[in-house]
Amino acid sequence: MSAVTFRSVAAESGWSLGAVQKTFPTKEALVRATLAYAQSSIAVRLSADPGRPTLRAWLVELVLATLPLDDARRSACLIGVAVSDRAPFDPELAASLAAWDADLRGKLQLLAGRARSEGELHPDVDGDVLARAVLAFAAGVAGQLLYEPRDEAHVRPLVQATVAALTPAPTAPPLE
């Protein structure tokens, strides 16, 4: 967890090193607080009229919002990687990540259900499979962009094509 240190948090937040150490008595407490902060920034993105104007367009913007395409998102991705790398060795952190993922998948499943009922999404698309695929794709692309940065103009077509493949529209009945 070299990315999350008392000094780096103090520098980023504008707090004194002593204030950070007093607020977070252990590195584990600091890591958990950093994770909670990162999750809250994603939650704000999720709350902005989810699934609109279409599920497909919204998922594209959601994935792009989580990719390291600028300094702020790159920092968030680095924290995410550092936290997830630590999770197998920290049961409390692992439980927090698992709960967050389950909640996010549940919300994406609800949006998929709404899109199916509104005729936007093929009825055979399973919401859980869609949610897991979108999250796995976003994590994979984010990881690649950390070591091979690209700008949004380069990445957007890839995200659009992948989300389109994961969200097929209902097929039209044959003409008679």
Language model regions located:
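Residues in soluble alpha-helical coiled-coils and helical-bundle/repeat scaffolds
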Residues: 25-29, 33, 50, 54, ...
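Hydrophobic/aromatic-rich alpha-helical bundle segments in the mid-to-C-terminal region
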Residues: 94-98, 102, 116-166, 173-176
